[in-house]
């Protein structure tokens, strides 16, 4: 509804969407558009602050109330340093020229920097920032360059932001008088003023009540008079005074930055980058940990891979941060990742199809192990990620070895944990732990009959290696990772706290269990996943069925339909080299090395 000024009982009253408001009403509250963007004064070192960004994995959790405050130079520099440590650097100031030395870019959202006019010839600008796909105005401001100003959208994920900058020129008095005479100030619509003054950009936009109040002052007289603010409203614009830019990533350099310190989820996210590049036709630069991009560099020749330390050498058109952003952050992600799941959250950040597609990896290495074998990984970065059943791994490994499988553990560490809570590789498995490259682990995974693991990075590697994955996880819901028909979860007990929006994961608490920590029900999500449950899922894997049928044919007198409850005897050569040790929180067990021919340990070069 257009806003109108009418005389009522000798005193003008404002009519509009918000009801009735008299001239002595308090100043209007901050509009929705204003709350969606930042308009901040840069610190004295001319480094403009941007919105506080929650970095991945809880390392930069910033409460919502802190996201709109101006920062001191020290605070801003510290924020940039933290961001660079996590993702890599972006230019301090935007790098794309607009008009009158105003610059912008799409690094960390749409950023616009208006420098102060040094010659004293100040100019007034109207700044529009609009998401063009949805038609949402995220910034509508009028400013004068008698001081420098920095604008930064709250939204950091992929959006079609358009930028319009209008250089305002004073309107001749004759046109102003015609406007006043035309309406007689008895019934005036702001929309009509815009149309009459040839304001093509904004004449179709809804004029909010607070904007009207800023432009008019109602006096206790028979007719309202205009104050100085109306001069701003009654100005027109010619084509050479307007700059407009719509988001256009084609053939532009765009950073997609992965958290440097995080490995697991980053492995599974890479197929979304290729989809993003095909969609935008941009020159994509993947900023990643070298340990990961060595895995993908030859598989994706159209994507350029760089390390975080090299980002200072570029001036990208746009930049997007990949990661899991905590505490209900919707600044770096359009949806809370707990609703979407770890695997698909990047598809929402980049606005691409979220179909599960495993990234391509090199699977050309020759097979090194002749016998049928199974790979396992038992360690996790938090205790809730592990399989906490007291005899789970031992019974599963014993059964698989009984029917003829070699069971190889490919964790990084033989012993992992925190304090006195330690997880060891299961007895009876072959030790292939160590600080190996991802490609070395894929070379083992690609030829195994199946992999048994947790919600961890090795499970993402197994997915890339295209082997069947038995994924044991209770603290995540099934949609959190990629789809596997061999998912093992017990929904009859507490489960899925990772994807529970009421629970914020604590990265500094290895024993995190948000609902039952310190009670007998702690970690019941995996404690109540039995070995029989896991073996029943394994029994549906075709390769296992063939192995089991072969064993049954060779041992018709033995019953193996159920999992083994007794420990199988150790071979003589293993008994000789058995090591007994007491483990403290500061020790690591190093099992004696054995040759490839003498099981159970193998050493693959």
Language-model segments: residues:
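Charged, low-complexity eukaryotic segments
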Residues: 63-64
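Short, basic, low-complexity termini and linkers enriched in Ser/Thr/Gly/Pro
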Residues: 41-44
């Amino acid at each position: 509804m257009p806003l109108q000024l009418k005389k009522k009982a000798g005193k003008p009253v404002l009519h509009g969407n918000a009801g009735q408001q008299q001239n002595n009403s308090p100043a209007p509250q901050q509009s929705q558009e204003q709350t969606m963007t930042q308009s901040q004064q840069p610190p004295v070192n001319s480094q403009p602050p941007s919105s506080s960004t929650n970095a991945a994995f809880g390392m930069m959790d910033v409460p919502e109330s802190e996201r709109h405050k101006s920062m001191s130079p020290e605070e801003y520099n510290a924020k940039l340093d933290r961001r660079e440590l996590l993702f890599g650097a972006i230019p301090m100031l935007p790098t794309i020229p607009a008009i009158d030395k105003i610059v912008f870019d799409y690094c960390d959202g749409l950023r616009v920097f208006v420098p102060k006019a040094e010659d004293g010839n100040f100019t007034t600008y109207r700044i529009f920032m609009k998401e063009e796909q949805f038609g949402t105005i995220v910034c509508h401001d009028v400013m004068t360059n008698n001081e420098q100003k920095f604008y930064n959208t709250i939204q950091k994920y992929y959006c079609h932001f358009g930028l319009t900058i209008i250089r305002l020129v004073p309107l001749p008095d004759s046109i102003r008088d015609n406007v006043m005479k035309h309406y007689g100030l008895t019934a005036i619509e702001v929309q009509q003023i815009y149309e009459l003054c040839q304001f093509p950009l904004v004449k179709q936009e809804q004029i909010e009540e607070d904007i009207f109040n800023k432009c008019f002052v109602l006096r206790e007289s028979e007719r309202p008079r205009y104050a100085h603010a109306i001069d701003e409203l009654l100005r027109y614009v010619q084509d050479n005074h307007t700059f407009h830019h719509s988001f256009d990533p084609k053939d532009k350099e765009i950073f997609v930055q992965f958290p440097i310190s995080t490995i697991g989820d980053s492995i599974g996210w890479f197929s979304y980058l290729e989809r993003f590049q095909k969609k935008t036709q941009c020159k994509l630069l993947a900023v990643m940990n070298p340990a990961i991009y060595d895995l993908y560099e030859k598989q994706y020749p159209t994507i350029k891979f760089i390390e975080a330390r090299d980002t200072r050498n570029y001036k990208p058109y746009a930049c997007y941060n990949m990661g899991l952003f905590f505490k209900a952050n919707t600044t770096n992600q359009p949806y809370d990742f707990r609703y979407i799941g770890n695997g698909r959250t990047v598809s929402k950040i980049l606005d691409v199809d979220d179909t599960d597609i495993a990234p391509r990896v090199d699977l050309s290495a020759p097979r090194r192990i002749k016998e049928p074998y199974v790979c396992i990984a038992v360690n996790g970065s938090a205790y809730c990620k592990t399989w906490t059943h007291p005899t789970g791994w031992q019974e599963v490994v014993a059964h698989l070895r009984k029917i003829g499988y070699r069971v190889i553990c490919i964790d990084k560490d033989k012993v992992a944990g925190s304090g006195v809570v330690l997880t060891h590789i299961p007895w009876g498995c072959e030790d292939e732990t160590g600080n190996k490259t991802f490609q070395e682990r894929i070379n083992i995974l690609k030829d195994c009959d199946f992999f048994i693991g947790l919600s961890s990075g090795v499970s993402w590697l197994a997915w890339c290696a295209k082997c069947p994955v038995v994924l044991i996880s209770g603290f995540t819901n099934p949609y959190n990772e990629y789809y596997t028909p061999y998912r093992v979860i017990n929904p009859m007990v507490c489960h899925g706290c990772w994807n529970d929006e009421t629970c914020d994961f604590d990265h500094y608490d290895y024993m995190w269990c948000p609902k039952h920590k310190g009670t007998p029900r702690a970690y019941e999500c995996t404690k109540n996943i039995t070995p029989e449950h896991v073996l029943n899922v394994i029994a549906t894997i075709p390769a296992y069925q063939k192995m089991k049928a072969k064993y049954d044919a060779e041992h018709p007198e033995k019953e193996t339909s159920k999992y083994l409850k007794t420990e199988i005897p150790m071979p003589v050569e293993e008994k000789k080299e058995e090591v007994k040790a007491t483990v403290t929180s500061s020790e690591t067990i190093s099992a004696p090395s054995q040759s490839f021919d003498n099981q159970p340990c193998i050493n693959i070069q």
